[in-house]
């Protein structure tokens, strides 16, 4: 039986994307899930199912509560989605159970599975399961099945690059779209 522990960044500085990815995955599990969060926040607490257990780590870089749960056999697989935690040191700490991570870079990780929702090639060895590309983005089905909505013959697009766009990717996308057509309504919401 899978006993899943999810260590996810939910601090104010991390944005909601990490939690949303893990929450989408959690909907596929009927068994109890142990959630290891950075800090208390009623928004996240209210979304996590009653059958699940929420445990708060002391710091955003901390995993001691999760390590305790592993030693007590409460969890036997870890899903990790946080930029604040050094994944390679985590993989050494939890070498006896599978470790699956969400990643947004192609950097090599010594884990059992890497999920990257971006269309990049991952630098992993053949012993690591690598799932890369938009089809592996855990998106809720309520968003996937939406119909294209046209207003006044204009096509409305939502471009979301997460909380931080230090490389200016959003503006590059908008510039590319502007070249394709003049019928695009542009709104940047941060």
Question: Across the structure, where does each feature detected by a protein language model lie?
Answer:
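A nucleotide-sugar donor-handling region in carbohydrate enzymes
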Residues: 110-167
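A short, Lys/Arg-enriched amphipathic alpha-helix followed by its capping loop at the start of a domain
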Residues: 25-32, 176-181
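Short, flexible, glycine/charge-rich loop motifs used to bind or transfer phosphoryl groups or to couple energy/partner
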Residues: 68-69, 103-106, 145-150, 177
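Active-site and donor-binding regions of nucleotide-sugar-utilizing enzymes
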Residues: 6-29, 38-130
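Short internal beta-strands
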Residues: 32-40, 186-190
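Donor-nucleotide binding loops and adjacent catalytic segments primarily
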Residues: 152-190
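Extreme N-terminal starter segment of soluble prokaryotic enzymes
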Residues: 1-5
